[in-house]
Amino acid sequence: MNRRRKLLIPLLFCGAMLTACDDKSAENAAAMTPEVGVVTLSPGSVNVLSELPGRTVPYEVAEIRPQVGGIIIKRNFIEGDKVNQGDSLYQIDPAPLQAELNSAKGSLAKALSTASNARITFNRQASLLKTNYVSRQDYDTARTQLNEAEANVTVAKAAVEQATINLQYANVTSPITGVSGKSSVTVGALVTANQADSLVTVQRLDPIYVDLTQSVQDFLRMKEEVASGQIKQVQGSTPVQLNLENGKRYGQTGTLKFSDPTVDETTGSVTLRAIFPNPNGDLLPGMYVTALVDEGSRQNVLLVPQEGVTHNAQGKATALILDKDDVVQLREIEASKAIGDQWVVTSGLQAGDRVIVSGLQRIRPGIKARAISSSQENASTESKQ
């Protein structure tokens, strides 16, 4: 009996030692399993913004040209200043035009006198015709002379009206409210009616247009996504934000007005036009800008933090995920668009997948890893709501 006890005690001691070693090995193995931060994907909706290049265009442009010829005797504006509709810009010497008006009025008076005399003669001939004191031919001649005299009165009246208009045209006015440009003529210059060169250009800059360029591919993609319900657009005006050439955001929000139905054959693009308030004149014609157009709300979107997306040697987007057995798997994905610090993934991943976003340098496909909650998971969830 004592002998059995002596043999049993060493055996129990060895067994305990082996168990302790196994537990220690398990702890060491667990400690060696790399920890990775993951984000669990869930579908949501997100506003889609298209970044488009563009240039500013005046809302209205008036190239001022004289409608009568003559000598410029006065300029009534300061270059670069605001002018209102109807303001006088130039004064053309009115003396020759006034003389033409006076001559036209004299011709009208003469025509009226001739017509009055012809009417008296015609009335007399009409009375005598009833008593056969004049021939029918004399009566017809008197009637013809009266008609010609009345026609001459009409022509003379038109000449007076035209001369009056020409005299008014001697005062060259602005047809719009806007900012005047550089004058191309000075006092003393001879100008002609409807000449090719403008005297000055007036541009209305508040509001102001921005012409944007969008590729046909993006234009068709957006139409297809709206038609299929992938993008839900709010009825009404489409808001547009603007980034200036210095990188700063323009303080006013614009709206999309229309899209040109014609494709530019040289660039393969379409033109979109937006309109912006410009009360302070910060936007000038010809400025290069970048617009952010709100395409609408994309439904059932999977957003993946940019840290979780890499590109292989072929340039294709990939992501590492943890499967249900905590084994690292490599997925090839389609990351169609970047929104902020996240990618919109359209294929290769699904809701519920755990995408690895941190600890990537410690893992490779096929090994086990231990998931820990990522701080980006909350941010990702908030962006979808």
Swiss-Prot record:
One of its GO terms (biological process) is response to antibiotic. It comes from the Bacteria. Belongs to the membrane fusion protein (MFP) (TC 8.A.1) family. A lipid is attached at C21 (S-diacylglycerol cysteine). A lipid is attached at C21 (N-palmitoyl cysteine). It holds the Pfam family CusB_dom_1. Residues 1-20 form the signal peptide. It is found in: Cell inner membrane. The lineage of its organism: Bacteria, Pseudomonadati, Pseudomonadota, Gammaproteobacteria, Enterobacterales. Part of the tripartite efflux system MdtEF-TolC, which confers resistance to various compounds. GO terms for cellular component: plasma membrane. It is a lipid-anchor. Keywords: Antibiotic resistance, Cell inner membrane, Cell membrane, Lipoprotein, Membrane, Palmitate, Signal, Transport. Homotrimer. Part of the tripartite efflux system MdtEF-TolC, which is composed of an inner membrane transporter, MdtF, a membrane fusion protein, MdtE, and an outer membrane component, TolC. The complex forms a large protein conduit and can translocate molecules across both the inner and outer membranes. InterPro entries: CusB-like_dom_1, CusB_D23, MFP_Efflux, RND_pump_MFP. The keyword Membrane applies. This is Multidrug resistance protein MdtE. The keyword Lipoprotein applies.
